[in-house]
Amino acid sequence: MRVIISAAGTGGHINPGIAIANKIKKEEPNSEILFIGTSRGLETDLVPRAGYELKTLEAYGLKKEISFTNFKNILKTINSSRLAKKYIKEFKPDV
């Protein structure tokens, strides 16, 4: 079974994702698990340390005011959406 888990930012999302991955590996030892997260969150440390592959995306929130930073973040989000589709297409997950 091939599984993608998306978890980023804080341990509140990453640790449950790792727990789910561990349970899947226990039940289905031949399963392949891929994590997708950001390049600046806790996942860059926690996921590889748990023994799982991590692919990263650049995702940023938007500010309330109109700014050049918001424009750049929108472009990064569009690019990250394309990259996420690429990761999914290449990995071909069952779940």
Task: Go through each PLM region and give its residues.
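Short, Lys/Arg-enriched, disordered terminal segments
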Residues: M1-R2, K26
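Conserved nucleotide-sugar phosphate-binding/catalytic loop shared by glycosyltransferases and other
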Residues: V3-A8, N30-S81, Y87
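Short amphipathic alpha-helix
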Residues: H13-K25
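Helix C-cap/helix->beta junction micro-motif
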Residues: E28-P29, F91
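Proline-aspartate-enriched helix->loop->beta-strand connector
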Residues: I88, K92-V95
